[in-house]
Design a protein with these regions (language model features):
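Active-site-proximal structural segments of metal-dependent nucleotidyl cyclase/transferase enzymes
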Residues: 8
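Composition- and surface-driven signal marking solvent-exposed, interaction-prone regions
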Residues: 85-90, 138-140, 147-154, 165, ...
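Aromatic/acidic polysaccharide-binding cleft in carbohydrate-active enzymes
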Residues: 20-133
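Acidic, Ser/Thr/Pro-rich beta/coil linker or hinge segments at domain junctions
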Residues: 157-180
Length: 180
């Protein structure tokens, strides 16, 4: 996704250097083989932590390119492909993708902040919301290894209130340390 947006943005920048025209990404998300025993025409897919990582990385990419990406639409939202909810009769389940969207909503309407990553295995983005709060979203891309993350924040860290929310599977896969 990053390569596609980067290449399209480069072409658009030639003809629209003021970035008046936005790029719209339509129907992004995972697309796997149909679940056995389901109607192939309905494209039902179970959702897992893998889908949460795809959503997190993709939303980070959109955040990095917020100067050009003005809208991005998940392919499906209910019971199909990378759904945010699954339903059966009167029952409803929020998927890992739902929880990623819930965590990432703090970036909407914000200003992208420059962020530097030293090392491998993590994908992240940062923004400042209209109230001046800084939000950092991090994805650990390792299937097996937990990752330790140390954040160096410019400014007065003692006067800042920190909060972390971690979406994970059976194992703790991300350890966060903050320093000024």
């Amino acid at each position: 996704m990053d390569e596609l947006i980067t290449k399209h943005s480069a072409i658009m920048d030639e003809y629209d250097p003021e970035k008046r025209v936005g790029l719209i990404v339509d129907e992004w998300g995972t697309w796997y083989d149909v679940e056995p025993g389901t109607n192939p025409g309905f494209l039902f897919q179970q959702n897992s932590i893998r889908d949460a990582l795809v959503a997190g990385v993709t939303l980070n990419i959109f955040n990095h390119h917020a100067d050009r990406v003005h809208m991005a639409n998940l392919a499906q939202t209910i019971n199909v492909l990378q759904s945010i909810v699954l339903t059966e009769g009167d029952k409803m389940l929020k998927t890992p993708t739902y929880h990623v969207f819930d965590l990432y909503k703090v970036h909407q309407g914000g200003r992208v902040l420059p962020i530097e990553l030293i090392g491998e295995g993590l994908h992240l983005s940062a923004s400042s919301d209209p109230l001046g709060k800084t939000h950092i979203s991090v994805c650990n891309l390792s299937q097996w290894e937990p990752v330790s993350l140390e954040l160096a924040i410019n400014g007065e860290a003692d006067s800042v209130q920190w909060q972390a929310t971690i979406l994970t599977g059976d194992r703790e896969m991300l350890i966060i340390r903050l320093r000024s």
